[in-house]
Amino acid sequence: TSRIFRFAQGAAPVQLDPALSPVASTYQVTAQVLQTLLVADHYTGSPETTDSLCREWKISDDRLTHTFVLRDNVHFSNGTALTAATVVQNFQRWQALATGEATAALAVPAQPLYAWGFGVPEQPAQQKASADTSAASSDTASPTAGASASATADAQSTASPSADPMSHGAQKDADAKAETTKPEPKPVSFTPLVTSVKEQDGAVVVTLSRPSLSFGRILTQQAFGIIDPALFGGDQKLTGIPVGTGAFRIESSEKGAVRLLPNEHFDGARPQIDEIQISTLTSSDKRYFALVEGIIDACDQVNSSDLGQLARDGYQTPGRDPFSLVYLNLNTAHPVLKNISVRRAIAHAVDRGALHQYYPQGTSDAQTLVSPSFRIQTDRPKEHTDRNQDLSRSLLATAGYSNQVIECYYPADVSLPWVDTPQKVYSEMVASLIEVGLNIVPVPLTWEQYHAKVNEPSSTRGIALAGFYGMYRDPYAFFGPVLAPMIAEQQVRSLVTEAPESMTTGVKAKAAELPSSEGADSNIRIQATPSPQPSFSPSPANPEESASVSPSPTPTPSPSATPVPVDASPSFLQIMESIRAADSAESVDAQRELYAKVISQLGQFMPAVPLLNATSKVAVSRSVQGYQTEQNAIEFFSKLRLS
């Protein structure tokens, strides 16, 4: 009799390319198939070589050169040998995806390695001409210096108009004229974090542009699982099902159902199960009944109301740490959300306490955009997120907001580790925004549509209900996904501005169409047309979500809010400068202090509103032994046993 492990998750893999689909439903499949150069320790998250593709990982004294010595006799499931050249080709693929116009917004995990903002800022051309070699050496040692002057000038030029709310009306015409005549500034160019990857004496040598505490940890995530390069197409997208070196291989994948069989070429301990079947059941009720009826052996995202009965019936219900973030992504290129006062108003309007009823015990309010498990101490952490409806209304008055429509995207007909019932959470959340006078229009999207749209550069998308589990043990595992849309915007803009003037096709032809976050660090005047359309909440996407959904209120007239002074905000360039400084620190303790500044800056700039640090539960049948939950919500099945 075959030993088959049957697992149900709440969302189908969008695709089976982990580099372009960095979501749990994809990773849960590829984790059984692909291996990475480094693996995170289960308890500490520290990168190590145990169970990885490497037998040795060496870092140079200056922390710029990382050498990966591969294990011998490792083969892909199709029999092809793993070589250093294979790994180099995978790095080249990640670079192409992170920097390409069509893929920059999707290849979020590879952004810190190759995309805009995380490497070393380049000097302007006129300065390069006169710079000597010693100055170049200084830039390498102090990677953030190059951005300092331009970042400071940017902050001074954009923050000052918002200091006095009474000047808002007087400056309307001048501001509008300035906005129509001010040219779009050329983005700062960056040397990527990874400057070179080459094969040397059978090893892989990676050279960085600056020291990075996160680099090794970044490589532990499934997005960097090594794939047979024979599957890389001309555009570097996969031409078929990924082939890896892990304990299993993908036999078939169709309509959210994936079948995996043991990899006959695997050089590790043979799994004690003969087959894995991963299916998709989008509601917790369906997963619950499939489990108790013996149709599946385990499932993700157990509803809190079912935990008691499952425990009484002898099922295992292991939980995960709340190493996650549920948040509202605020599109700084949107004509209304470009105004910093509107973004701050949303942060002060949200009622986080009302959302807890849809999450398991252990979920907590998120006051910042990073997990509290990093123990980063900040002054007044609630300053930018405390609920204060009066302040929210005053900030909207300061912005000149007048019922302009803001669309809010959220995933429908899906269940995710960070949100089991998106419709309920959306309805509860949006009610608090409507109460302060915001005109929110819901945009429910299928899982595939949501994944494609939530990070793409756009001036149409307003708010998005978003979330994730941290994929590696570093603060940038949280900051990176939150800032990904802005990084993708800058990356694509860099492609446009650096294209030859003679180019008449491709990215250069789309320059005028690019959305812009320019001015998002100030109280820039809202130019969008007010709308008579009222806010509303849609009907639940699923019948089972209809219970306990709070209806969105109709805004009621309130006394005219008084504009308030708007504190200056750091620019996005300054925030990235602070992130680079923290990531270049010599120790985790030093990094923690530097990231406290980043948290404060993000609280002022408010590119996203933190909502919750959510936990989730797994339910496992009595016949399954050895199931171990992981902090990043991606579990490995190769060591399971079935009785």
Regions flagged by a language model, labelled:
Residues 231-233, 256, 264-309:
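Ligand-site clamp/hinge motif
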Residues 397-471:
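Ligand/substrate-recognition segments at binding pockets and active sites
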Residues 8-61, 92, 243:
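N-terminal lobe/hinge region of extracytoplasmic solute-binding protein
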Residues 350-377, 421-428, 453-643:
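Detector for C-terminal structural segments
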Residues 56-119, 205:
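Aromatic- and charge-enriched surface segment that lines or borders ligand/interaction sites
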Residues 135, 140-145, 153-190, 203, ...:
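Gly/Pro-rich hinge or "lid" segments in bacterial periplasmic/extracellular proteins
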Residues 261-266, 320-345, 349, 358, ...:
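A bilobed periplasmic-binding-protein/Venus flytrap-type ligand-binding module shared by bacterial periplasmic
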